[in-house]
């Protein structure tokens, strides 16, 4: 069992039951999945960009991402339907908890001028989104072997009904909120 998974069962669940007064442990919000998405608009010019991004995401997530394709043609962006325009990976279970552990304890402190993550990036239904500007904050990425700095979006999906419950859940995982 992953370290954060044990931490969730032993510390987070009792803390949230006490804070919100849940009657059952099944009511306690939990993280269901973490989705990493890398949009690569510049990939229309060079196909090697997709391969490098897939390699980076594979190292970061620990599993192979799926290449996302354009749903419809947009002439203004010079893309046709079916063009590869990004890469995405969904983490669940053990891999999800291990990624969250690495992200909170190792990657976030490596962000330049880091003062904490925004407490307002919730979607109203208890899910949290965070954008990372550089993939080099992850220790798995070798700085000398990257071809370009790429950002990625990290979506944390929870079973929380409100943003307050989700924020309490993530805060109990030692998420460094600034406000």
Curated annotation (Swiss-Prot):
Annotated GO CC locations: ribonucleoprotein complex; ribosome
PROSITE patterns with a match to the protein in the record: RIBOSOMAL_L5
Keyword annotations: Ribonucleoprotein, Ribosomal protein, RNA-binding, rRNA-binding, tRNA-binding
A Pfam family it matches: Ribosomal_L5_C
InterPro entries (alphabetical): Ribosomal_uL5, Ribosomal_uL5_bac-type, Ribosomal_uL5_C, Ribosomal_uL5_CS, Ribosomal_uL5_dom_sf, Ribosomal_uL5_N
GO molecular function, one term: rRNA binding
SUPFAM superfamilies: RL5-like (SSF55282)
Keyword Isomerase in record: no
Transmembrane intervals: none
GO BP: any one term: translation
Keyword Ribonucleoprotein: yes
The family this protein is said to belong to: Belongs to the universal ribosomal protein uL5 family.
Job of this protein: This is one of the proteins that bind and probably mediate the attachment of the 5S RNA into the large ribosomal subunit, where it forms part of the central protuberance. In the 70S ribosome it contacts protein S13 of the 30S subunit (bridge B1b), connecting the 2 subunits; this bridge is implicated in subunit movement. Contacts the P site tRNA; the 5S rRNA and some of its associated proteins might help stabilize positioning of ribosome-bound tRNAs.
Assembly notes: Part of the 50S ribosomal subunit; part of the 5S rRNA/L5/L18/L25 subcomplex. Contacts the 5S rRNA and the P site tRNA. Forms a bridge to the 30S subunit in the 70S ribosome.
Protein name: Large ribosomal subunit protein uL5
Gene assigned in the entry: rplE
């Amino acid at each position: 069992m992953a370290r954060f998974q044990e931490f969730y069962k032993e510390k987070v669940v009792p803390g949230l039951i006490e804070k919100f007064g849940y009657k059952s442990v099944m009511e306690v919000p939990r993280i269901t999945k973490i989705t990493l998405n890398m949009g690569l608009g510049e990939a229309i010019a060079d196909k090697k960009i997709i391969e490098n991004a897939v390699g980076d995401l594979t190292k970061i997530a620990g599993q192979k991402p799926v290449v996302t394709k354009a749903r419809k043609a947009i002439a203004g962006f010079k893309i046709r339907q079916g063009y590869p325009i990004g890469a995405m990976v969904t983490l669940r279970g053990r891999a999800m908890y291990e990624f969250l552990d690495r992200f909170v304890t190792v990657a976030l402190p490596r962000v330049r001028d880091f003062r904490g993550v925004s407490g307002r990036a919730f979607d109203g239904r208890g899910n949290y989104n965070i954008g990372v500007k550089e993939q080099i904050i992850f220790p798995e990425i070798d700085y000398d072997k990257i071809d370009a700095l790429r950002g990625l979006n990290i979506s944390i999906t929870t079973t929380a009904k409100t943003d307050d419950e989700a924020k309490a859940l993530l805060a109990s995982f030692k998420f460094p909120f600034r406000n």
